[in-house]
């Protein structure tokens, strides 16, 4: 599930968000891998019980995140990695979720819970402004 300009709980304006949350819960319940980036991270986290709120300030631009738990997905990273941020809302960690990374202003930058992986940041964009890879 990728990003978008809406809020993860804007069900009245974007009814498809509710269906995405339902699909996220079903994927985790059945052990199917699911990845969320930015808004997708927030949809998965809230679908799994995390709280959504406005951040203290928008987090926009390239800035570092810190890996807090060495996980298979992130084992190739240094302890700190500079990534693109583009969000106003933040989520808490779902119950039983494993915190993987944080930034100075966003406590939950990445988490894992069962088959779900959520990343608030945009790893698909590099500092040169093009798609990574």
What are these regions (language model features)?
Residues 1, 132-133:
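Short, flexible, mixed-charge acidic loops at enzyme active sites
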Residues 6-8, 41, 90:
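Glycine-rich nucleotide phosphate-binding loop and flanking beta-alpha elements
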Residues 48-129:
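Pocket-forming structural segment of enzyme catalytic cores
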Residues 8-9, 43-46, 128:
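Short catalytic/ligand-binding loop motif for oxyanion handling, primarily in non-cytosolic enzymes
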Residues 1-35:
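Flexible gly/pro-rich beta->alpha loop and the following alpha-helix that scaffold active-site loops
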Residues 27-51:
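Catalytic nucleophile loop
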């Amino acid at each position: 599930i990728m990003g978008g300009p809406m809020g993860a709980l804007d069900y009245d304006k974007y009814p498809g968000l509710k269906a995405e949350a339902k699909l996220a819960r079903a994927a985790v319940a059945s052990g199917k891998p699911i990845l969320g980036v930015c808004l997708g991270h927030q949809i998965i986290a809230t679908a799994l019980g995390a709280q959504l709120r406005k951040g203290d300030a928008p987090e926009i631009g390239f800035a570092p995140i810190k890996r807090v738990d060495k996980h298979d997905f992130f084992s190739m990273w240094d302890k700190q990695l500079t990534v693109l941020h583009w969000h106003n809302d933040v989520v808490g960690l779902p119950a039983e979720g494993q915190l993987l990374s944080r930034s100075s202003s966003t406590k939950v930058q990445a988490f894992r819970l069962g088959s779900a992986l959520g990343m608030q940041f945009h790893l698909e964009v590099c500092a040169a402004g093009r798609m990574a890879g």
